[in-house]
């Protein structure tokens, strides 16, 4: 059983245009202590994982390769999507590439995470739950009533509900209740368990993804076959439907760096000069 860090790197960071562009999305900008968010993700998770598997796309896989090389990571797998088909398919491709008992720790490539000890504790708990056959998501304790994230309603590690991005009044209500967490977009599970649930809950995504993966050549997926895959997020496809779901309530510092405000706050926290 290997623990594999699956890095999803297909996003284009459109909310940060023109800083983030299709030719160089935000995860490849070296503006975080001289490193990119992609590099920081791979290096951070190397402490818990035996290997790295990058699911990227035809537009950015060369950037991923360069970032990994510059970070000193020589050994990795890659799957190159011909066209974006959302996260359910992207994660399915990663699961097909691994052994059924392998634990996949799925992370976006463009998140900034601090509080290393707290992060380590949460990841280790998620891996333990995954080894027991659960599908695990991470719930981040909200620092403010954020309207840009989805929320998870929890009772301990039990998931009571997933909630869409709320309006401000609803977000404030979530904060007051104390058992609502930001949906981080990070997951942990055994490859075989995920595929079993995907096949049961969204058979069309499973079958078309499998057919596409069977024709992979030198890490690259076929565009014509890829276009037949339904474009569905992993939240809708599996997380909100499976009875194997668990959540790890977490308190580490986290940001999806999805706005100029987030970058401003990061630079301010790092002590960089800020225009008044």
Per-segment meaning from a language model:
Residues 1-3, 49-50, 74-75, 100-102, ...:
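Short coil/turn connectors at secondary-structure junctions
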Residues 28, 78-79, 135-137, 247:
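Conserved beta-strand scaffold positions in the cores of enzyme catalytic domains, especially
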């Amino acid at each position: 059983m290997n623990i594999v860090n699956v890095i999803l790197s297909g996003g284009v960071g459109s909310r940060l245009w023109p800083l983030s562009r299709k030719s160089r999305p935000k995860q490849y900008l070296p503006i975080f202590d001289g490193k990119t968010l992609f590099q920081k993700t791979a290096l951070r998770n190397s402490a818990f994982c035996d290997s790295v598997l990058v699911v990227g796309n035809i537009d950015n896989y060369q950037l991923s390769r360069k970032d990994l090389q510059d970070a000193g990571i020589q050994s990795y797998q890659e799957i190159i999507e011909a066209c974006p088909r959302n996260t359910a398919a992207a994660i399915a491709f990663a699961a097909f590439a691994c052994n059924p008992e392998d634990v996949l720790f799925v992370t976006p490539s463009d998140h900034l995470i601090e509080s290393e000890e707290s992060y380590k504790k949460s990841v280790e708990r998620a891996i333990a739950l995954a080894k027991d056959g659960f599908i695990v998501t991470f719930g981040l304790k909200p620092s403010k009533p954020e309207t840009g994230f989805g929320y998870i309603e929890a009772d301990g590690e039990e998931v009571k509900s997933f909630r869409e991005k709320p309006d401000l009044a609803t977000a404030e209500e979530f904060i007051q209740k104390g058992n609502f967490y930001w949906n981080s977009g990070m997951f942990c599970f055994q490859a075989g368990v995920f595929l079993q649930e995907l096949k049961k809950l969204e058979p069309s995504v499973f079958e078309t993804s499998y057919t596409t993966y069977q024709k992979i050549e030198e890490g690259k997926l076929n565009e014509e076959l890829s276009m037949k895959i339904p474009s569905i997020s992993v939240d809708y496809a599996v997380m909100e439907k499976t009875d194997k779901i668990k959540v790890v309530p977490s308190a580490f510092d986290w940001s999806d760096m999805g706005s100029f405000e987030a970058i401003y706050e990061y630079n301010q926290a790092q002590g960089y000069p800020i225009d008044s």
